[in-house]
């Protein structure tokens, strides 16, 4: 994972949930030393729990069964004392205004987590750039970098570049 190259041994980061974020957490837990992952995802915490390279801090809150994440005001209380360099987030969709989510509570929780990070990095499959969500997550200007596959539509890449968002692609044939 190209996004894993941005994380160093001994670093503390935040990771929200989603398939790409889970793969990142697995890569870090397997191939980095002393990485602390702060997450609201019970799935990610459980998925990497036996890996010796990662220390997990699971943020508490209201549990959403389908996505296995914690949301709501308790997450805000839990995350308040932290500040990290990077927050890694997935997305459900994209439009000319930015990134989108399909769940209001989850979007609000992600924005709270983003307030405690110097940089926001999106990890997503390129197909999400052809889909929309029901609520706004971030304007693309609030996102430092996007990691996706090489199928990203050129219009989306141009919008991101115009907003000073770095776009990193990997071959979709991998």
Describe every region a protein language model picked out:
Residues 40:
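Short beta->alpha hinge that forms the Motif I/post-I loop of the SAM-binding pocket
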Residues 23:
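N-terminal active-site wall of soluble small-molecule enzyme domains
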Residues 20:
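Hydrophobic/small residue at the entry helix of a nucleotide-binding pocket
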Residues 43-174:
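Conserved phosphate- and dinucleotide-binding cores of soluble alpha/beta proteins
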Residues 1-17, 26-37, 49-53:
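HTH-adjacent hinge/linker in prokaryotic transcriptional regulators
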């Amino acid at each position: 994972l190209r996004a894993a190259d941005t994380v160093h041994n001994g670093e503390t980061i935040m990771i929200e949930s989603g398939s790409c974020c889970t793969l990142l957490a697995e890569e870090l837990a397997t191939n980095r030393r002393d990485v602390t992952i702060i997450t609201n995802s019970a799935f990610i915490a459980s998925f990497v729990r036996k890996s010796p390279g990662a220390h997990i801090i699971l943020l508490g809150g209201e549990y959403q069964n389908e996505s296995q994440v914690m949301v709501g005001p308790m997450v805000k209380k839990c995350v308040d004392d932290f500040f990290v360099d990077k927050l890694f987030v997935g997305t459900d969709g994209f439009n000319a205004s930015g990134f989108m989510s399909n769940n209001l509570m989850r979007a609000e929780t992600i924005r709270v987590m983003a307030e405690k990070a110097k940089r926001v990095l999106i990890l997503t499959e390129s197909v999400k750039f052809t889909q929309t969500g029901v609520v706004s997550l971030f304007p693309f200007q609030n996102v430092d970098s996007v990691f996706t596959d090489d199928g990203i539509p050129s219009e989306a890449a141009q919008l991101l570049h115009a907003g000073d968002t770095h776009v990193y692609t990997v071959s979709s044939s991998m």
